[in-house]
């Protein structure tokens, strides 16, 4: 997963159950949410209820994308179209105008637990035919008619300890796998990520040795932990983190932390905070550059002079211009 959540430009939907032979469609994220909301909700509902429900649908979808729930299991899509697993999506389905306008307004806002960064797995059901521990769609209508605002409706169902992230950056959905195997001698943030995840998995599978210290270096301790993980989960025990091992670690780690459940253990900022080199230069690439771009894009919501910057992971001309502008407007006057 990316270090910090972003709203994907596009999302890939499987039009059926995960193992069915149904086709995939890749659509803009906003179009996906508009379609889901138009098939899950009634446009005549109070606006507060619509906004609360749409916020839950956004958070649900972003959780699937951020945790790579399906991709870590070997599927080539982000979410399914069926309410048996996810939320209703009808390819080519109609969209209601008022729902479309609400989505345009809030598509990059989502729910988190206080202190956590991952989009909340905002489970919901209709509250009449089916019941669940999350939001009741028809119940939200009653709350809205009683005068509750969207945030109060969400608090009623998900607890008082939720926050809303507003205006999250929009970027392409980039797979978390670094694109090359990690092995003895590898170095970087991807190595550190694997070390941290294996150490958390150790709490549930104590046979996997603890990696200490956690660093950016793929050392003997890391290799030993990877081999034991591979043995436990029936992978080739080569001690190398290729794509299959990377995503199996991701799947198990997401499972033990319950990140794709309403009662999530949560993911804090310190858990994903990358270690930074002292200097980044024009032409540099990698997750550190993406992180700087994320903060520059975030700053743009508060500093109108800040030029837009895409999360490309490449220190390019746009990134350089954004850095110059940031320094110009934030550096103390001499």
Task: Describe these PLM feature segments.
Residues 1-279, 285-294, 300-304, 321-328:
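Conserved, single-site charged/polar hotspot
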Residues 329-334:
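Conserved small/polar residues in nucleotide/adenosyl-binding loops
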Residues 307:
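Surface-exposed loop/turn segments and immediately adjacent short secondary-structure elements
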Residues 312:
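Histidine- and aromatic-enriched segments that form or immediately flank copper-ligand environments
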